[in-house]
Design a protein with these regions (language model features):
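Polybasic, glycine- and aromatic-enriched phosphate-binding surface used to engage nucleic acids
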Residues: 1-150
């Protein structure tokens, strides 16, 4: 499909000095920003040290983010398409699906649509429940084990 997976690179509590409430900075996407209906919703956190924005260079490339899980709670399979988004970086509790080959916008949209349709397939949730149980979904598992139903 011309896609690969990597884990978000920002560990927010190791970058506290770069966090800011200033919306003119880069958006830091957390797994808690992914809603149950698989959209992104920015938020104000209860923990004052945790902020939605960060003073770092970001990307505007389209990706799909997938919840990795926290290790201390029941795993919930959630994902969201990130496109037409302000510059962003991704926190380490999310995996990112991104293109590894050059694709025009039309082709990339088609490929991402196939992935999302597969994620919406009831077989995907059934597979996750059987194979992963309450454990999180690693980069390697997402890339090599989770089936994409086309």
């Amino acid at each position: 499909m011309g896609l690969s997976v990597k884990t978000g690179t920002v560990v927010w509590n190791e970058r506290k000095e770069l966090l800011t409430p200033d919306e003119t900075n880069t958006t830091l996407l957390y797994n808690t920003n992914v809603t149950n209906d698989n959209k992104i919703k920015l938020t104000k956190f209860k923990n004052d040290e945790k902020q939605q924005y960060i003073n770092m260079e970001g990307s505007t490339d389209p990706i799909i983010v997938v919840n990795r899980g926290n290790g201390n709670a029941k795993y919930t399979f959630k994902y969201a398409l990130i496109e037409k988004f302000a510059p962003y970086v991704v926190e380490n509790h999310l995996n990112m699906i991104y293109p590894t080959t050059s694709m025009d916008k039309k082709k990339l949209t088609k490929v991402f649509k196939q992935v999302i349709q597969s994620f919406e397939n009831p077989k995907t949730r059934e597979f996750i429940a059987l194979f992963f149980g309450n454990n999180g979904l690693s980069k390697t598992e997402l890339e090599t084990i989770l089936p994409i139903y086309v």
